């Protein structure tokens, strides 16, 4: 297992959940957190603890977004019309690294971030190497021609463990994806339950 995989699965162990639904997650074999004290029985969490855990889980899912970035996204979500929790999910799903992952151009969120940073992705025909780039409805995302035969791309196409959600229209022959609409929480194919309303409560304290 690579260092990147170890870091990724450490999030699973800390949460005690297989948050990406990966078959190789160590949580499939044990139900305690990382480290020598991971097997200690956990007590009941306080309301604050439950809210914090919900925030850590969602941050971890989106490739461990920094607190500064995550809070900035939350603030933007509160300024939009509608439910702040739903808005938060919509903004996270508009991140370019999320769309690349959802489109099955790569196998993990972490790989999506690296793939973009290395210049393998175009948006509307122009190279974009910023993983936090905000995709708009109607944008077309594509893998660069020279990158389409990379092993990481070919492997991701074969993954049976997840499907492309219906708010992204993908052509894997051309390696293109069109972002069709901003999803609601219920549209997003999370492997575990996400609770953005608890994150709103956390930041509203």
From Swiss-Prot:
One of its GO terms (cellular component) is small ribosomal subunit. Gene3D superfamilies: Ribosomal Protein S4 Delta 41, Chain A, domain 1, RNA-binding S4 domain. GO terms for molecular function: rRNA binding; structural constituent of ribosome. PROSITE patterns: RIBOSOMAL_S4, S4. One of its GO terms (biological process) is translation. SMART domains: Ribosomal_S4, S4. The keyword rRNA-binding applies. It comes from the Bacteria. Residues 18-46 are annotated as: Disordered. Residues 94-157 form the S4 RNA-binding domain. The keyword Ribonucleoprotein applies. Keywords: Ribonucleoprotein, Ribosomal protein, RNA-binding, rRNA-binding. Part of the 30S ribosomal subunit. Contacts protein S5. The interaction surface between S4 and S5 is involved in control of translational fidelity. Belongs to the universal ribosomal protein uS4 family. One of the primary rRNA binding proteins, it binds directly to 16S rRNA where it nucleates assembly of the body of the 30S subunit. With S5 and S12 plays an important role in translational accuracy. This is Small ribosomal subunit protein uS4.
């Amino acid at each position: 297992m690579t260092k990147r995989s170890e870091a990724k699965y450490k999030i699973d162990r800390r949460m005690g959940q297989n948050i990406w639904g990966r078959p190789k997650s160590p949580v499939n074999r044990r139900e305690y957190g990382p480290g020598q004290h991971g097997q200690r029985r956990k007590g009941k969490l306080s309301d604050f603890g439950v809210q914090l855990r919900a925030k850590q889980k969602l941050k971890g899912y989106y490739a461990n977004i920094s607190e500064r970035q995550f809070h900035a996204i939350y603030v933007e979500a509160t300024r939009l019309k509608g439910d702040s929790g739903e808005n938060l999910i919509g903004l996270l799903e508009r991140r370019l690294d999320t769309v690349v992952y959802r489109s099955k151009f790569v196998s993990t969120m972490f790989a999506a971030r690296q793939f973009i940073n290395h210049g393998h992705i175009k948006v509307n025909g122009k190279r974009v190497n910023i993983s936090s780039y905000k995709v708009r409805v109607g944008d077309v995302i594509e893998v660069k021609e020279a990158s389409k035969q990379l092993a990481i791309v070919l492997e991701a196409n074969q993954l049976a463990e997840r499907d492309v959600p219906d708010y992204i229209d993908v052509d894997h022959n051309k390696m293109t994806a069109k972002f069709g609409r901003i999803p609601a929480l219920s549209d997003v194919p999370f492997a575990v339950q996400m609770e953005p309303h608890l994150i709103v409560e956390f930041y509203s304290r």
